[in-house]
């Protein structure tokens, strides 16, 4: 928490206008690691049926609550890489809700791959912060439930830097 406060926000509260600071830092790290531009995207997963579509405003739809947050980034090379960035620090109800929503989002990624075995999509979930680190084992356990685990990365920025070429 202190590192994020000092390094990413220059000592300022990270809310409002600076709430994207952590995501922007993670995006920059991915671009430095891969040497590729990580473009923003409006792609979302439907949490009920594991379909995917470009959707900028799910709140205008009757099924608005069935849609995930959008993926934070996309890199297309030989495969299509969809990135999800999270930095969760501290403890409390907000952090617990974020982690729970994230769990269902990542679980849906596995179902999407299972339902679309010929897709060239690889999901990259970069999860930083002390709260994420403490719960990362729950997400690793999730990988053991699906044979599609080789097409989903779950880990922090440092682990991604070490292993990104495997994906």
Predicted regions located by residue number:
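Interdomain/boundary linker segments immediately adjacent to catalytic/signaling cores
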Residues: 1-44
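Charged, often glycine-rich, active-site loop that binds/positions anionic groups
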Residues: 46-65
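Short glycine/proline-rich turn/loop motifs
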Residues: 7, 83-89
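Conserved aromatic-histidine-acidic binding/catalytic patches
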Residues: 10-18, 65, 90-94
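Active-site beta-strand-loop-beta-strand hairpin of nuclease catalytic cores
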Residues: 67-82
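Domain-level recognition of nuclease-like catalytic cores that cleave nucleotide substrates
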Residues: 119-167
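Hydrophobic, Leu/Ile/Phe/Ala-enriched alpha-helical segments that form helix-helix packing faces
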Residues: 25-37, 105-113, 143-146, 164
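Catalytic cores of nucleic-acid endonucleases
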Residues: 87-134
């Amino acid at each position: 928490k202190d590192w994020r406060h000092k390094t990413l926000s220059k000592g300022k509260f990270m809310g409002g206008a600076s709430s994207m600071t952590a995501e922007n830092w993670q995006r920059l790290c991915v671009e430095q690691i891969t040497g590729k531009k990580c473009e923003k995207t409006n792609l979302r997963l439907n949490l009920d049926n594991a379909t995917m579509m470009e959707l900028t405003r799910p709140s205008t739809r009757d099924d608005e609550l069935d849609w995930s947050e959008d993926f934070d980034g996309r890199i297309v090379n030989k495969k299509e890489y969809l990135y999800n960035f999270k930095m969760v620090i501290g403890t409390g109800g907000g952090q617990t809700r974020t982690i729970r929503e994230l769990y269902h989002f990542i679980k849906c990624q596995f179902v999407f791959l299972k339902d679309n075995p010929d897709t060239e999509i690889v999901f990259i979930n970069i999860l930083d912060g002390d709260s994420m680190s403490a719960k990362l084992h729950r997400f690793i356990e999730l990988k053991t439930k699906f044979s599609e685990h080789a097409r989903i990365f779950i880990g922090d920025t440092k682990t991604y830097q070490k292993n990104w070429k495997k994906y």
